[in-house]
């Protein structure tokens, strides 16, 4: 008899069949059951809802992985429940209209930290470690927790983790400027910005008129 689960989003009955299962994590022992009916999220992002996660033999509600006894920022370890949580959060980022950076999944070239508060996953940030300088790839705060300074907390943790120059792979330039202003990495000065922390701009960030509005380096 085929096991079935109800999709919590569209209400469809989803059968546990090979065509509905993917293994996108570091071990094939962790399986993801997807609803076969695509949905359209924010900014027309097409996605499939995560119905269940099979974690080492047991099918679990995805929400279970976003609950933990941890507190604060913790690095994600491959093959653990935190890796599943990271996968779920990235899927949520896409569903909510956020950009997914190519190659920012967990690997030997990418590390990530999840922020936990009151036993709940608040969000995460990831960084590339194989680039010229440490580069923040993605940062995400879940909608229900925004406005509490959590993005600032994660930016500050990233900066404090590296003594030398860093870079930020931000699609939304205004968002990047605002966050760096909040943590004191840059400050407004005259017609542009003064760098208080050594930050390298990526190739597509180089145009000062588009990005920094006539930046001034200290």
Language model regions located:
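Terminal substrate-recognition subdomain of acyl/acetyltransferases
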Residues: 1-133, 160-218
């Amino acid at each position: 008899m085929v096991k079935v689960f109800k999709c919590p989003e569209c209400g469809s009955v989803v059968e546990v069949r090979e065509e509905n299962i993917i293994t996108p994590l570091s071990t094939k022992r962790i399986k993801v059951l997807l609803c076969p009916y695509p949905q359209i999220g924010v900014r027309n992002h097409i996605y499939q809802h995560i119905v269940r996660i099979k974690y080492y033999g047991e099918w679990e509600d995805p929400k279970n992985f976003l609950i933990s006894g941890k507190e604060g920022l913790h690095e994600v370890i491959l093959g653990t429940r935190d890796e599943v949580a990271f996968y779920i959060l990235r899927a949520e980022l896409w569903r909510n209209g956020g950009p997914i950076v190519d190659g920012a999944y967990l690997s030997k070239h990418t590390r990530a930290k999840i922020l936990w508060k009151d036993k709940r996953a608040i969000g995460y940030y990831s960084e590339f470690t194989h680039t010229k300088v440490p580069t923040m790839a993605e940062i995400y705060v879940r909608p229900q927790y925004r406005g509490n300074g959590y993005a600032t907390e994660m930016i500050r943790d990233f900066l404090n983790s590296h003594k030398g120059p860093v870079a930020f792979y931000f699609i939304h330039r205004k968002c990047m400027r605002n966050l760096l202003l909040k943590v004191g990495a840059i400050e407004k000065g005259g017609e542009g910005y003064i760098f208080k922390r050594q930050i390298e701009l990526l190739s597509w960030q180089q145009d000062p008129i588009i990005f920094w509005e006539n930046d001034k380096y200290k």
